[in-house]
Structure formats: structure tokens, C-alpha cells
């Protein structure tokens, strides 16, 4: 379907008949090599089977969604999500479940449209603050430099797999040949006051050795209704490596909000 002017790959998984809860979850994937497949292969089917309508889509420039040369600020991603929900007729609040950059998008959407968000589950994510922008600039600059070298793909295949090499090739094409690396850190960024003003319930799921290992409680200490779950011995790839536990956390969380 066309979303905010772009051909967008959207997948709907309706709640299983007989157990419909009336709740809707929107899955927001991460940046780079990620796509809606990461949720389709982990959370989408069991969440729909539990009676929750599930919406997944490839973010602009990712997966099967159209890839413009420019237009990758967080404001662009927020506008895409808002248009998608409007086109689907979803005016009631939804649960946003975001992995990595998808969680960052969820926070920005909740700040811009608080009446449309019932709750947030963020997996290895943080809001788009100045600190986040500095971190993202470093990560993206390093990624561009790494993927610009041919030997990097040999290293990826040797240490992971040929499949990971193909994913890295696609990510390199996206990052090097669009403005995404320059646009994303621009925000618009949220002040700490704006983060504190996000009033919906938030569940932050982190790996103890993940991207927020320097201060695991920094985010939830700002949020008026924030809760934290930490997986010991886990890095950034929480969704893929701990998907069964994440599934139970998400299902329990949504059931609590609906009670």
C-alpha cells in the first residue's frame, strides 16, 4: 500500500477468532539489515494467536518498502507510522513494540501523538535524545567506514554466514547510497523533559551487555510509568536470541494494560 507517498510493505495478522481481545500491536523493526521479518519469525504469529491484532511493516528504505534517496529523519518515520494507522482506520490507541531503532521511533511517535499510543514495549531501545544522537552518529560513521571496505564482507561471511554477507551487502547499499546515515541523528530530538512527559506505560527490555549497559536504569528512571526487564549474559540481539522469553513478556504486558 502507499504510505506517506511511498510504496510500503505491510503485513496484517488478525487476532485468532474466538480469543480476540480488541487490542492492537504494531511492530517496528530496527535499522540497517532489519525488516519486518525479524518480528514475523519471532513474535507476530504467537501474539496474533493470543487474540491481538498485529500490524508489521517495513520501514522506509528497508525490506520491500520503497527506498527514496533522502528523507530519513525521525520526523519522516513518525509521519509514515501516523499515515499508516490513519489509513487502516486505527484511531484507538495501539501498543507499539519496537526493536532497536523501532523503539526509538515508538518514543518519538508517542511524544508527537500521545492519544494514539496505549503502551510501548522497547527492546534494546532508547528515545532520540542528544545522547542518543551522539551515539548514533558514531555507530553510523563506523558502519559506513566498515561497509565501504570489500574485506569487511569476507570477514562477515567467515565469522557468521553467507546469508549475513548478503544482508550486509543490502545494508551497505542502503546506508552508503541514501542519506539515512546523515538524516537519522538529526531527529528531531526529544528533550529530557519531553521524555519525562511520555505518559503511557513503557516496558524496556534490555540485555545486560547491550547498548545501554553503562546505565541500565537511565531510561526507566525518567519515565513516569516505566518498567525494566534485563536479560543477564545478553547483548543487543535480544529479540532474536531470547524471542521466547520476549514473547511471554509482551503477551503478559499487553494483557496487563488491557485489564
Task: Indicate residue ranges for each PLM-predicted region.
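Conserved HGGG/HGGXW glycine-rich cap/lid loop of the alpha/beta-hydrolase fold
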Residues: 6-64
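Glycine-rich His-Gly loop
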Residues: 27-31, 100, 207
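Active-site loop/oxyanion-hole signature of alpha/beta-hydrolase fold enzymes
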Residues: 49, 53-97, 248
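Hydrophobic, aromatic-rich cap/lid helix
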Residues: 164-194, 208-209
Amino acid at each position: 500500500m502507499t504510505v506517506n507517498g511511498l510504496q510500503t510493505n505491510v503485513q496484517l495478522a488478525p487476532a485468532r477468532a474466538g480469543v480476540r481481545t480488541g487490542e492492537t500491536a504494531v511492530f517496528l523493526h530496527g535499522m540497517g539489515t532489519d525488516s519486518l521479518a525479524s518480528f514475523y519469525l519471532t513474535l507476530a504469529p504467537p501474539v496474533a494467536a493470543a487474540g491481538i491484532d498485529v500490524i508489521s511493516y517495513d520501514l522506509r528504505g528497508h525490506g520491500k518498502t520503497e527506498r527514496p534517496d533522502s528523507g530519513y529523519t525521525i520526523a519522516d518515520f513518525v509521519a509514515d507510522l501516523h499515515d499508516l494507522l490513519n489509513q487502516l482506520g486505527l484511531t484507538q490507541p495501539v501498543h507499539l513494540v519496537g526493536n532497536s531503532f523501532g523503539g526509538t521511533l515508538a518514543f518519538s511517535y508517542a511524544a508527537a501523538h500521545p492519544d494514539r499510543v496505549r503502551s510501548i514495549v522497547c527492546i534494546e531501545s532508547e528515545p532520540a535524545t542528544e545522547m542518543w544522537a551522539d551515539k548514533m552518529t558514531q555507530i553510523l560513521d563506523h558502519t559506513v567506514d566498515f561497509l565501504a571496505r570489500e574485506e569487511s564482507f569476507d570477514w562477515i561471511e567467515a565469522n557468521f554466514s553467507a546469508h549475513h554477507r548478503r544482508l550486509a551487502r543490502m545494508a551497505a547499499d542502503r546506508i552508503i547510497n541514501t542519506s539515512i546515515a546523515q538524516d537519522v541523528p538529526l531527529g528531531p530530538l526529544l528533550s529530557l523533559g519531553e521524555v519525562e512527559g511520555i505518559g503511557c506505560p513503557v516496558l524496556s527490555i534490555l540485555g545486560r551487555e547491550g547498548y545501554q549497559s553503562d546505565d541500565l536504569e537511565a531510561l526507566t528512571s525518567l519515565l513516569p510509568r516505566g518498567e525494566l526487564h534485563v536479560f543477564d549474559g545478553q547483548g543487543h540481539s535480544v529479540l532474536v536470541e531470547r524471542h521466547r522469553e520476549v514473547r511471554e513478556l509482551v503477551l503478559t504486558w499487553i494483557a496487563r494494560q488491557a485489564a
